[in-house]
């Protein structure tokens, strides 16, 4: 679990995810503030149902995306590419995620947007601080970690 621990530690320090969905061959990307749950290996975001990405996702859909910093030096590049599934949360599951999200982003208390979970199934973490092009991969299906 060393790979997942390193990835989780880095993701916990970031706050913006780019997510991409598709519907009938049409692609769309969006940015959102996220809360990362290391135990569930999932992001939680708030987004209105009327947004294009939510409309294309429906209640549940495949998703891919990235999280990255903005370093000015190639040697400091770090970032995640992922694929997984996005779904709108309901009921108690939504309430629990919203409470945690509001702790991370207190201003979100004023928003009524639904809570969505992005369950990560594959993560590739590039970390040039460990050496140029250093990559770590985590796969949910097999618990596999590659360095």
Curated annotation (Swiss-Prot):
InterPro entries: Split_barrel_FMN-bd, UPF0306. SUPFAM superfamilies: FMN-binding split barrel. NCBIfam families: PRK03467.1 (NF002900). Belongs to the UPF0306 family. HAMAP family: UPF0306. This is UPF0306 protein YhbP. The gene is yhbP.
């Amino acid at each position: 679990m060393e790979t997942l621990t390193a990835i989780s530690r880095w993701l916990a320090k970031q706050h913006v995810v780019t997510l991409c969905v598709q519907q009938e061959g049409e692609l769309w990307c969006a940015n959102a503030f996220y809360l990362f749950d290391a135990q569930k290996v999932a992001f939680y975001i708030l987004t209105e149902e009327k947004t294009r990405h939510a409309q294309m996702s429906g209640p549940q859909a495949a998703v891919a995306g990235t999280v990255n910093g903005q370093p000015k030096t190639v040697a400091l590049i770090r970032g995640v590419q992922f694929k997984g599934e996005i779904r709108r949360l309901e009921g108690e599951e939504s309430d629990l995620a919203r409470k945690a999200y509001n702790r991370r982003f207190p201003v979100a208390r004023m928003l009524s947007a639904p809570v969505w979970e992005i369950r990560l199934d594959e993560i590739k973490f590039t970390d040039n601080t460990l050496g140029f092009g250093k990559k770590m991969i985590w796969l949910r299906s097999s618990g596999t970690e590659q360095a």
